[in-house]
Protein backbone atom coordinates (compact mmCIF):
# COMPACT_ATOMS: atom_id res chain seq x y z
CA UNK A 1 0.00 0.00 0.00
CA UNK A 2 1.14 3.56 -0.65
CA UNK A 3 2.43 6.13 1.76
CA UNK A 4 0.50 8.63 3.89
CA UNK A 5 2.22 12.02 4.15
CA UNK A 6 0.76 14.38 6.72
CA UNK A 7 1.20 17.65 8.54
CA UNK A 8 0.14 18.17 12.13
CA UNK A 9 0.46 21.25 14.30
CA UNK A 10 1.15 21.35 18.04
CA UNK A 11 -2.42 20.25 18.69
CA UNK A 12 -1.40 16.84 17.28
CA UNK A 13 -4.97 16.18 16.06
CA UNK A 14 -3.90 15.08 12.59
CA UNK A 15 -1.00 13.07 14.02
CA UNK A 16 -3.34 11.18 16.35
CA UNK A 17 -5.68 10.39 13.46
CA UNK A 18 -2.85 9.12 11.24
CA UNK A 19 -1.38 7.04 14.09
CA UNK A 20 -4.74 5.29 14.54
CA UNK A 21 -4.70 4.28 10.87
CA UNK A 22 -1.68 2.05 11.45
CA UNK A 23 -0.44 2.74 7.91
CA UNK A 24 3.03 3.67 6.72
CA UNK A 25 3.33 7.43 7.19
CA UNK A 26 5.77 10.34 6.99
CA UNK A 27 5.26 13.66 8.77
CA UNK A 28 6.02 17.01 7.15
CA UNK A 29 8.22 18.80 9.68
CA UNK A 30 6.91 21.94 11.35
CA UNK A 31 10.13 23.70 10.33
CA UNK A 32 12.30 23.00 7.31
CA UNK A 33 9.65 21.55 5.01
CA UNK A 34 11.78 22.78 2.10
CA UNK A 35 14.28 19.98 2.77
CA UNK A 36 11.62 17.27 3.16
CA UNK A 37 11.37 15.15 0.00
CA UNK A 38 9.12 12.23 -0.87
CA UNK A 39 10.10 10.02 -3.78
CA UNK A 40 7.09 7.74 -4.06
CA UNK A 41 3.32 8.09 -4.52
CA UNK A 42 1.46 9.32 -1.46
CA UNK A 43 -1.88 10.51 -0.14
CA UNK A 44 -1.67 13.78 1.79
CA UNK A 45 -3.54 14.20 5.09
CA UNK A 46 -3.80 17.85 6.03
CA UNK A 47 -5.56 19.98 8.66
CA UNK A 48 -7.51 23.07 7.63
CA UNK A 49 -6.68 26.47 9.05
CA UNK A 50 -8.52 29.52 7.80
CA UNK A 51 -10.09 32.75 8.78
CA UNK A 52 -13.80 33.38 8.27
CA UNK A 53 -13.19 34.10 4.58
CA UNK A 54 -11.27 30.88 3.92
CA UNK A 55 -7.87 32.55 3.63
CA UNK A 56 -4.91 30.59 4.92
CA UNK A 57 -6.70 27.22 4.77
CA UNK A 58 -3.58 25.28 3.79
CA UNK A 59 -0.77 25.36 6.37
CA UNK A 60 2.36 27.17 5.14
CA UNK A 61 4.51 24.07 5.71
CA UNK A 62 2.26 22.09 3.37
CA UNK A 63 2.42 24.85 0.75
CA UNK A 64 6.23 24.79 0.90
CA UNK A 65 6.22 20.99 0.67
CA UNK A 66 3.95 21.03 -2.40
CA UNK A 67 5.88 23.88 -4.04
CA UNK A 68 8.65 21.32 -4.60
CA UNK A 69 7.89 19.87 -8.05
CA UNK A 70 9.11 16.38 -7.12
CA UNK A 71 6.91 16.22 -4.03
CA UNK A 72 3.92 17.59 -5.94
CA UNK A 73 4.51 15.03 -8.70
CA UNK A 74 3.96 12.14 -6.29
CA UNK A 75 0.69 13.26 -4.67
CA UNK A 76 -2.21 10.98 -5.62
CA UNK A 77 -5.00 12.23 -3.36
CA UNK A 78 -5.83 14.37 -0.35
CA UNK A 79 -7.69 13.84 2.92
CA UNK A 80 -8.54 16.89 5.04
CA UNK A 81 -9.26 17.47 8.69
CA UNK A 82 -11.29 20.39 9.90
CA UNK A 83 -13.85 21.68 12.34
CA UNK A 84 -17.50 21.77 11.26
CA UNK A 85 -18.01 24.84 13.48
CA UNK A 86 -16.40 26.79 10.64
CA UNK A 87 -19.26 25.99 8.25
CA UNK A 88 -18.33 26.35 4.58
CA UNK A 89 -14.61 26.35 5.31
CA UNK A 90 -14.78 22.90 7.01
CA UNK A 91 -12.06 20.83 5.32
CA UNK A 92 -11.29 23.66 2.86
CA UNK A 93 -7.60 22.72 2.66
CA UNK A 94 -8.66 19.52 0.87
CA UNK A 95 -10.62 21.46 -1.74
CA UNK A 96 -7.71 23.84 -2.36
CA UNK A 97 -5.10 21.09 -2.70
CA UNK A 98 -7.38 18.89 -4.80
CA UNK A 99 -7.95 21.70 -7.29
CA UNK A 100 -4.38 22.99 -7.42
CA UNK A 101 -2.74 19.56 -7.65
CA UNK A 102 -5.53 17.98 -9.74
CA UNK A 103 -5.94 14.99 -7.43
CA UNK A 104 -9.07 13.51 -5.86
CA UNK A 105 -10.35 14.79 -2.52
CA UNK A 106 -10.77 11.39 -0.90
CA UNK A 107 -12.19 12.09 2.56
CA UNK A 108 -12.89 14.73 5.20
CA UNK A 109 -12.99 14.22 8.97
CA UNK A 110 -13.53 16.40 12.00
CA UNK A 111 -10.74 17.14 14.51
CA UNK A 112 -9.17 13.76 15.42
CA UNK A 113 -11.82 11.72 13.60
CA UNK A 114 -14.11 9.01 14.89
CA UNK A 115 -13.54 5.26 14.87
CA UNK A 116 -15.84 5.19 11.83
CA UNK A 117 -13.59 7.74 10.08
CA UNK A 118 -10.53 5.62 10.82
CA UNK A 119 -12.22 2.48 9.45
CA UNK A 120 -13.47 4.34 6.37
CA UNK A 121 -10.04 5.75 5.58
CA UNK A 122 -8.25 2.42 6.13
CA UNK A 123 -10.69 0.60 3.86
CA UNK A 124 -10.66 3.46 1.37
CA UNK A 125 -6.85 3.49 1.20
CA UNK A 126 -6.78 -0.25 0.47
CA UNK A 127 -9.22 0.22 -2.41
CA UNK A 128 -7.51 3.39 -3.63
CA UNK A 129 -4.01 1.91 -3.79
CA UNK A 130 -5.31 -1.29 -5.41
CA UNK A 131 -6.85 0.81 -8.21
CA UNK A 132 -3.69 2.95 -8.49
CA UNK A 133 -1.63 -0.18 -9.20
CA UNK A 134 -3.84 -1.28 -12.10
From Swiss-Prot:
Pfam families: Flavodoxin_NdrI (PF07972). One of its GO terms (molecular function) is FMN binding. GO terms for biological process: protein modification process. It comes from the Bacteria. InterPro entries: Flavoprotein-like_sf (IPR029039), RNR_Ib_NrdI_bac (IPR020852), RNR_NrdI (IPR004465). Probably involved in ribonucleotide reductase function. Belongs to the NrdI family. This is Protein NrdI. It comes from Rhizobium leguminosarum bv. trifolii (strain WSM2304). The lineage of its organism: Bacteria, Pseudomonadati, Pseudomonadota, Alphaproteobacteria, Hyphomicrobiales. The gene is nrdI.
